[in-house]
């Protein structure tokens, strides 16, 4: 809904991580929600899109310049085999991040691609990324007791995202 508050937003680089049935209490339909996110793709000079998300892929036709990322082994920008790749070059091992979940590795990759689109070198921020503990209440491990890992994700708005990003039994 925050995009609605910025009708004249025209970023040089924008990104859409996913479009899932969330925040539907604010919209008449999922199509209306997707249209609100689509505006970002259209208004961005360069748009970084999640190539794993069918709804994001549908936006590509409307966007000007698209950079894709995802998890498919055929994607040049991907999270796969325990690492982040940009243009098929391994740049970071996922295990070097302090963040839980595949979604966080994908978020990091998206941010690195946005930096690159702005003309900055992703390698310059890798040391900081390795130290970043994440935000409070966002997929944070709080304890591990008798082989059970306890994760605080109390800021999450979509349980489906947690189910997808934490393949271990919950």
Stretches found by the model and what they are:
Residues 1-62, 68-69, 80, 92-99:
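Flexible active-site lid/hinge loop adjacent to a nucleotide/diphosphate
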Residues 13-14, 46-47, 67, 140, ...:
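Structural motif
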Residues 18-19, 50-52, 69-72, 88, ...:
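Fold-independent oxyanion-binding glycine-rich loops
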Residues 50-51, 64-81, 126-130, 140-143:
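Beta-strand->loop->alpha-helix junctions that form or flank phosphate-binding loops
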Residues 82-88:
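Short polybasic amphipathic segments
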Residues 88-89, 147:
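Residue-level detection of beta-strand-connecting loop/turn positions
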Residues 94-170:
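Nucleotide phosphate-binding/pyrophosphate-handling subdomain across enzymes
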